[in-house]
Amino acid sequence: MLINKLWLLLVTLCLTEELAAAGEKSYGKPCGGQDCSGSCQCFPEKGARGRPGPIGIQGPTGPQGFTGSTGLSGLKGERGFPGLLGPYGPKGDKGPMGVPGFLGINGIPGHPGQPGPRGPPGLDGCNGTQGAVGFPGPDGYPGLLGPPGLPGQKGSKGDPVLAPGSFKGMKGDPGLPGLDGITGPQGAPGFPGAVGPAGPPGLQGPPGPPGPLGPDGNMGLGFQGEKGVKGDVGLPGPAGPPPSTGELEFMGFPKGKKGSKGEPGPKGFPGISGPPGFPGLGTTGEKGEKGEKGIPGLPGPRGPMGSEGVQGPPGQQGKKGTLGFPGLNGFQGIEGQKGDIGLPGPDVFIDIDGAVISGNPGDPGVPGLPGLKGDEGIQGLRGPSGVPGLPALSGVPGALGPQGFPGLKGDQGNPGRTTIGAAGLPGRDGLPGPPGPPGPPSPEFETETLHNKESGFPGLRGEQGPKGNLGLKGIKGDSGFCACDGGVPNTGPPGEPGPPGPWGLIGLPGLKGARGDRGSGGAQGPAGAPGLVGPLGPSGPKGKKGEPILSTIQGMPGDRGDSGSQGFRGVIGEPGKDGVPGLPGLPGLPGDGGQGFPGEKGLPGLPGEKGHPGPPGLPGNGLPGLPGPRGLPGDKGKDGLPGQQGLPGSKGITLPCIIPGSYGPSGFPGTPGFPGPKGSRGLPGTPGQPGSSGSKGEPGSPGLVHLPELPGFPGPRGEKGLPGFPGLPGKDGLPGMIGSPGLPGSKGATGDIFGAENGAPGEQGLQGLTGHKGFLGDSGLPGLKGVHGKPGLLGPKGERGSPGTPGQVGQPGTPGSSGPYGIKGKSGLPGAPGFPGISGHPGKKGTRGKKGPPGSIVKKGLPGLKGLPGNPGLVGLKGSPGSPGVAGLPALSGPKGEKGSVGFVGFPGIPGLPGIPGTRGLKGIPGSTGKMGPSGRAGTPGEKGDRGNPGPVGIPSPRRPMSNLWLKGDKGSQGSAGSNGFPGPRGDKGEAGRPGPPGLPGAPGLPGIIKGVSGKPGPPGFMGIRGLPGLKGSSGITGFPGMPGESGSQGIRGSPGLPGASGLPGLKGDNGQTVEISGSPGPKGQPGESGFKGTKGRDGLIGNIGFPGNKGEDGKVGVSGDVGLPGAPGFPGVAGMRGEPGLPGSSGHQGAIGPLGSPGLIGPKGFPGFPGLHGLNGLPGTKGTHGTPGPSITGVPGPAGLPGPKGEKGYPGIGIGAPGKPGLRGQKGDRGFPGLQGPAGLPGAPGISLPSLIAGQPGDPGRPGLDGERGRPGPAGPPGPPGPSSNQGDTGDPGFPGIPGPKGPKGDQGIPGFSGLPGELGLKGMRGEPGFMGTPGKVGPPGDPGFPGMKGKAGPRGSSGLQGDPGQTPTAEAVQVPPGPLGLPGIDGIPGLTGDPGAQGPVGLQGSKGLPGIPGKDGPSGLPGPPGALGDPGLPGLQGPPGFEGAPGQQGPFGMPGMPGQSMRVGYTLVKHSQSEQVPPCPIGMSQLWVGYSLLFVEGQEKAHNQDLGFAGSCLPRFSTMPFIYCNINEVCHYARRNDKSYWLSTTAPIPMMPVSQTQIPQYISRCSVCEAPSQAIAVHSQDITIPQCPLGWRSLWIGYSFLMHTAAGAEGGGQSLVSPGSCLEDFRATPFIECSGARGTCHYFANKYSFWLTTVEERQQFGELPVSETLKAGQLHTRVSRCQVCMKSL
């Protein structure tokens, strides 16, 4: 039973493990010697047969069986009952045709049909006769200059020239550097140099004195002021409208009491202009500066035709061309032979001061005496194999040993230096790997292969072997430190124990311990089995040359000799190097305070720390003064008195005074240093190993809808280009940094089989099926370095990069080889004081220093007695205006204002002042004050940088004397006006002008008559000039991660990497598991606290240049440091070696003008000048005959025009437009995030193996070549250094189209491109005969807008405008706004060059304000300038984000109800009918479109047509009793021929007895106005006698009565929509309209007119009662008519 349970348990465990492993990754690497990849395999014994089980339950019913066979026939049945009546039969046949009927009556003729569609076009006409062949056209203009061709082949060597002695030969090659010359005498002082570039802005000067009182400014924009004092009574208003004549006559109210004084009346009209003022008392202005050069005048009239010139003589032969490009680098030379042994070095020199200059080490000495007793002998021969041991039993693990005592705390180690140490001791043997394949045959030894049939048990552990052989002799060490003078002898008391230090780093393995005592001899053990082959030990370093050996037989080691006697004291050596600075001593005891002499009064010290608050002072007299200007920086204070004697420091360590010391052992690694400053960008290192794949990225956010008229998506990736021309060989790069140690290599490749060749490659297999995506494999080994491919084609020129940040100072170069020691020179004379140095870069802000010692205490003087108040002074003269006062106390928070209107867009703000310092950080470890480091050597020349930003305006260089050029003279006096010349010939078309301002919209053109034939597609144009690079694009939205790529094939095994530098010891890991299965790595520990700063170590070797780091974020602009004081002039140094050529010097003083030189070479073609004005139109020529069609040559594309001004931002379009053309390539963006891992490429073709196996040594660097001309874009460079190792994600899914970005700002102007290729020359035609004078042409289309005209004179002052409609003033609280803060000071501009003084012109008129210029690039942030004058009002600013809600203000007084303001009209119309003779005014705030007469409806052919009184069609501008005409089918129209009628809204005039006509009609016809309303108007009806309210947010226009319907012509009439304003008439009348007869021209009220009105309905009558009939007489009519109100939405 127990066995069964165990069996079940094992099976369960196996199943569980299989299930658990089902979803996991199978990992084939060995794990602790076990095979963990498969499931458990268990083979227990088979169990005995079990007991029989109980009887099972009854099974379910089986399925239905198959159908049986057919049975026998039954007996015949009985007769059935009769059936029901059957259905109807089918329809019968068609009967015979009937008799024809009678003819019908003719129908009424139908209406004429619609005109038919346009017929198809007619047939083409006959071709015209072919015209006569025209004369050939004139010669075309010469083509533009083509781009420079490819450099030609190097020409053959020229013929020798016999040069007479007067000619100067060609310049020879540069000679070898000459020896240093003798120091020349001191030269005379040089001329002062040219004015240098503008220095950095100086410190802000003190505020200047207040200026004189300025002229009155423009009238400001006032805010609503506080409520004023009540005004006087206004003028009487105009007479009101006549009263409504209703049925009830209103007698008026009794007179009330006298009211209180009224509100102020409306603002009066502006007064008339006052008399002109007296002339001002200003003095005559100073002479103005010379005016700018005028714009080119208008072209003169056309001149007479010139005669044809004579052909010029042929030109002279050109001069010899410039030097060609430098040739390619030659091949590497063969390694030279080994040189001879050099001359012996110099002996010891002793200079004048007695200093010994030691020479090089001497030759090896003679062999020494026989040595002392040697160590243990070499290992003996190998003994015979022992007997195989017994199989070991697995022992029981021992008990845990007792816990050891805690060790003493170790001293703090010095900081180690990162060096590449020698190879370490061999590590412990690893576990046995799987057996490898047979290796290649060993070339050195021949061994018999031992065939082990079965592996034996492991043998017992052998004894420790004897001591190994002596190692090779080590390298001689450097001299050690020496402190001959000893340390400070005073020993301080022991300090208090410090706090426990942070966890130290894991130390390196300790040194090998001393050998222990020899154990007693063990019994002879049996011979062990052959052990595993140990790993190959590392090669030792190369030893120095050994001593000569005299004896051929190695002697036995002698006994150890006695200790030698004390040697004599050696000669005092040279002073050793400075020792390591000791630790800071403890504070000394207070010294004796001797009475010092009183020093001079010191300058004020630095402010001390904030003291305790003092007691409150007595109240002072007087008002607070204005703050004084900031003082200049004070003088430098004198040095303080020497401090008191400190306590004696601890005794220093005296090193033994041995000058030629040997290297000590390597120190323990120090604590990690603080992070250094960001290094400069390193050179590319060797390619690192491929990083592991990153995890899949998060899905990107979906893009927004693409809008039309914007650049489209990038096109598909083009096909691979053709291979490019071979590029020039690049310079050898610096050696890369040593890579990190490579991973252990995989199984070695099979050894070479000499004599056999590689077989031919097999045929390519078929495409396999796509496998499932594999899991992430182990990192592949680095592949072999591929053979360099052919250089690619010339790539396109890269875009202009963004200006790089200035690189940091380069690292110090490697020290040069030391030259021969020079003899120490005498002290030179003190040099002349140097020029002030250039201001250095602002230093980085240092860490906060230690708290200084307390300053010396000077006795504080007693406070003086309080002075008596002085007598009042005399009244002074009126002072000049004071400087601006201090900002007042902040006002109490005013009441909350209404939301202001959207402001204008402001100019870009000035860069802000430095922000408030952040909160104080944690206290840093005190840094030691560094000494000023030596200037670094010049770095290696960097690669060519990106094109920089345009520099500032340079200093004008002195003009080179050129032939036939004179300096520009002063501007001459103005000549008298010349007479008008003849019209000149029409000039050539000028260059494309700058885009003018947007012209006014042109008049619409007439539609074309003939549709043009669609032309053939023209040939592709030549490549246009490259556009300007766009500004840097904003970072795009991260796309979705792509699908995982397929696993790449394993690369070819790479060459072994160079040994990497030893890394710093890692942090201590967690305790590993005891089982031999690798545990998962633990989480990263918390960073330890910073250790104490170690003492300064010796200077380490210069490390290799590191990999380039990622591009850092742009740092914040540091605070400008104070300008340092110029240092005292230093003593002259020893003459140095000859330096490298210096940087170009600054421009010297401008020399005098030299004599005219010989004519210079023809310069390159200049940039096109600014376009001239268009010439006058030429005289009309005579019409020529038709020429033959010339060959169609596509013209050269013109140069790209200058970019136009930035357009206003358009409204977003609707819908998804078609993808636009690909946009111009933007400027180089910031460095993007590391890209996702692309799919694995196909395996490359095997590289070509070059025949040479020996790599040559790099050649010496060549001399610098001449500056070449601007080359073409070079070939694509080699692949850059590997990016930082990051997890490469799978390729993302394509994102949705992004939103189009806003239109970018204007880019910088690009460099003009090369001129296009010249077109093919056409055939020269015959000269045509002059044609006849043509007829004047039609008026052409409107021309392009002209240049802006000259500014006109100031016009007379316009008359005062009419008072505008008052705006809608919301009920606002009176807000008292405090004056805003002063604006930031503007940046001072670069001072311009001084122009020539012009003649004094008359004082010009005040110019108009210019348009805002194109915003320039942001200049560098200057120091704060002086406060600028008040600027012009800025453009409206963008609406800022909504501010936080302010505290609720105090309740202000209620303002007067404002007049309704004008809002933006959007085209709604509103019709107002007055029902009187007067034209009704439009409601306030609406504009009147037209006025007219109120037409209600018309009747024609006994049919009525109604007009809605709320629509503009009911207000006809002109009145007629017959406002329409009728027409019939015969295309005949009649007017006033029938009894047709028109019906008009009527007035309140009494009903006449007879029809009225002509001049009596107007008093009965209602007038109307059509108004433009800001929103829709509606009518609301109460169905009650009360006036309904407008909906919330709507305002009332008028109230009235609900007019529903009307009839007049029998049953004909019309009605009003109850939502229309026409259904609400202001006056109620039983007969609100009058009938006019068209034919008779009369109007009258007839008895068949009825008006229908909405009636009142009580709430209870809705469904409960029947309507009761009633008749209302005059006087009661209003009681049953519904009231209404017309409302409009308030905006």
Curated annotation (Swiss-Prot):
Could you tell me the Gene Ontology terms of the biological process aspect for this record? cell adhesion; cellular response to amino acid stimulus; collagen-activated tyrosine kinase receptor signaling pathway; extracellular matrix organization
Q: Which Pfam families match?
A: C4, Collagen
| Keyword Glycoprotein among UniProt keywords | yes
Composition-biased stretches, type Low complexity, lie in 185-197, 311-320, 421-431, 503-512, 526-541, 641-652, 660-703, 722-735, 802-820, 853-878, 1055-1068, 1234-1253, 1384-1397, 1429-1459
Which terms in the GO cellular component ontology are assigned?
collagen type IV trimer; collagen-containing extracellular matrix; endoplasmic reticulum lumen; extracellular region; extracellular space
- PTM (free text): Prolines at the third position of the tripeptide repeating unit (G-X-Y) are hydroxylated in some or all of the chains. Type IV collagens contain numerous cysteine residues which are involved in inter- and intramolecular disulfide bonding. 12 of these, located in the NC1 domain, are conserved in all known type IV collagens.
* Biased composition annotated in UniProt, kind: Pro residues: 198-213, 432-443, 491-502, 1275-1284
Q: Which residues form the Collagen IV NC1 domain?
A: 1467-1691
The molecular function terms in GO held by this entry are: extracellular matrix structural constituent conferring tensile strength
Q: Region 7S domain: start and end of each range?
A: 23-46
Positions of disulphide bridges = 1482-1571, 1515-1568, 1527-1533, 1590-1687, 1624-1684, 1636-1643
Q: Does the keyword Endoplasmic reticulum apply?
A: no
> Where does this protein have compositionally biased stretches of type Basic residues?
842-851
Q: What subcellular locations does the record give? A: Secreted, Extracellular space, Extracellular matrix, Basement membrane
> Where are stretches of biased composition, namely Polar residues?
1360-1371
Q: Where is this region: Disordered?
A: 108-338, 404-473, 486-881, 915-1099, 1185-1459
UniProt biased composition (Gly residues): 588-599, 1210-1220
Motif window: Cell attachment site:
515-517, 560-562, 986-988
Task: Cite the domain annotation text.
Answer: Alpha chains of type IV collagen have a non-collagenous domain (NC1) at their C-terminus, frequent interruptions of the G-X-Y repeats in the long central triple-helical domain (which may cause flexibility in the triple helix), and a short N-terminal triple-helical 7S domain.
Known role: Type IV collagen is the major structural component of glomerular basement membranes (GBM), forming a 'chicken-wire' meshwork together with laminins, proteoglycans and entactin/nidogen.
Summary of subunit composition and partner proteins: There are six type IV collagen isoforms, alpha 1(IV)-alpha 6(IV), each of which can form a triple helix structure with 2 other chains to generate type IV collagen network.
Q: What is this protein called?
A: Collagen alpha-6(IV) chain
Q: Which organism is it from?
A: Homo sapiens
